[in-house]
């Protein structure tokens, strides 16, 4: 029986060429797997037909937009996950859902190997292969760009030689990855980290220097998940899409950062994540009034470690599952409404309310009706500073000898 290989297929030049390239290099039949995580562009049927036209014996396509929003974006939101304080894990959280469908397709079509289009110096090769070996430990992995010397120039030449139904061009100098949670742009002109991004780089966001009138929006949450916008019920996918539109129109969610890649190098990245950043901002402000102080402090540490694990391709790891359990427990009271103004590249919260809030007006007010017993403060301060006071006395005693 002829060996079968499933290929993570985007519909672009590199993976279209990879179908024939893999076939010629290995003698295997190739099954193309395309997963829609909200990247937009062509329909799944168009992509399926192109895969078949490029030589795939089968084409597996999946509309995973709701799955991605519910099972991958929402845990990211609950964690307030920003890798190194900036990056909302746009590409990192899409890889596990793609891996899940790659392994599913491999089982369905009897494949023994999974192929992906990643290079040998990026994070995604790790995310794909660690995920595949976790969900399908018997499956082998290959990367045509890394393992079979498939360069961009060779891809163009191969496509033209074989007459493949795909545009061959070098016009776009950037590497772009996008989904409903955001958009990532790298390489080309951006590799000189002194170069400012040019306007043509952006697609999800309008220029914030000339914004339209301020847009006030109220986001309602239930147990950490957005359930309504301005009183209209929404699914997680709809919430992200609506805020991509509204926050994007105001230039919210542009990020220019040099980050530490898993493989040991620093890389300049431009991100656009209007919906994600607006939601994370709103969610964090709701947590500020619904989560107890010590729990909130520890959750911030957990969220940072969670982001590192996911960035590093450990979505399916035992530690990540344990952190998920903690984060989920913190969300049971994170319900209520956040009002924010979207304008000029910023999402500024100006109102919050919750039936499960820990904010007590009578304790917080400085006006008549204050129920806070200020007479307790003196004793509290004495005890709170006791250890520092004792240590200082010791230092003075020892140093004075």
Curated annotation (Swiss-Prot):
GO terms for cellular component: cytoplasm. Its EC number is 6.3.4.5. This is Argininosuccinate synthase. Transmembrane segments: none annotated. It comes from Pseudarthrobacter chlorophenolicus (strain ATCC 700700 / DSM 12829 / CIP 107037 / JCM 12360 / KCTC 9906 / NCIMB 13794 / A6). L-aspartate binds at residues 119, 123-124. Keywords: Amino-acid biosynthesis, Arginine biosynthesis, ATP-binding, Cytoplasm, Ligase, Nucleotide-binding. L-citrulline binds at residues 87, 123, 127, 175, 259, 271. One of its GO terms (biological process) is L-arginine biosynthetic process. ATP binds at residues 8-16, 117. Pfam families: Arginosuc_syn_C, Arginosuc_synth.
């Amino acid at each position: 029986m002829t060996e079968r290989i499933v290929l993570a297929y985007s519909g672009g030049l590199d993976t279209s060429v990879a179908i024939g390239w893999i076939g010629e290099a290995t003698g295997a039949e190739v099954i193309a797997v395309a997963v829609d995580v909200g990247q937009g562009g062509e329909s799944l049927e168009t992509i399926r037909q192109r895969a078949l036209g490029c030589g795939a014996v089968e084409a597996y396509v999946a509309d995973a937009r709701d799955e991605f929003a519910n099972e991958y974006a929402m845990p990211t939101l609950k964690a307030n996950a920003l890798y190194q304080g900036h990056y909302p894990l746009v590409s990192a959280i899409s890889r596990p859902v793609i891996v899940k469908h790659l392994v599913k397709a491999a089982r369905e079509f009897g494949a023994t190997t999974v192929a992906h289009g990643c290079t040998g110096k990026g994070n995604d090769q790790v995310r794909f292969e660690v995920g595949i070996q976790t969900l399908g430990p018997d499956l082998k992995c290959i990367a045509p760009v890394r393992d079979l010397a498939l360069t961009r120039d060779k891809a163009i030449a191969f496509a033209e030689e074989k007459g493949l139904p795909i545009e061959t061009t070098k016009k776009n100098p950037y590497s772009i990855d996008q989904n409903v949670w955001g958009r990532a742009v790298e390489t080309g002109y951006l590799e000189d980290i002194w170069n400012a991004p040019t306007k043509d780089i952006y697609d999800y966001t309008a220029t914030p220097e000339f914004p339209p009138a301020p847009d006030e929006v109220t986001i309602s949450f239930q147990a950490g998940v957005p359930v309504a916008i301005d009183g209209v019920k929404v699914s997680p996918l709809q919430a992200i899409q609506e805020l991509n539109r509204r926050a994007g129109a105001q230039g919210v969610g542009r990020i220019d950062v040099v980050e530490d890649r898993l493989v040991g190098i620093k890389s300049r990245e431009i991100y656009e994540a209007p919906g994600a950043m607006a939601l994370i901002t709103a969610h964090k402000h709701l947590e500020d009034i619904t989560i107890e102080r010590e729990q909130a402090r520890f959750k911030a540490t957990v969220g940072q470690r969670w982001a590192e694990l996911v960035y590093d391709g450990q979505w399916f790891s035992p530690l990540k599952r344990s952190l998920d359990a903690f984060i989920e427990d913190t969300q049971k009271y994170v319900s209520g409404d956040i009002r924010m103004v979207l304008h000029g590249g910023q999402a500024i919260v100006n109102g919050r309310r919750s039936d499960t809030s820990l904010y007590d007006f009578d304790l917080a007010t400085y006006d008549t009706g204050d129920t806070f017993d200020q007479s307790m403060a003196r004793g509290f301060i004495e005890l709170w500073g006791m250890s520092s006071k004792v240590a200082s006395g010791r230092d003075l005693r020892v140093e004075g000898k």
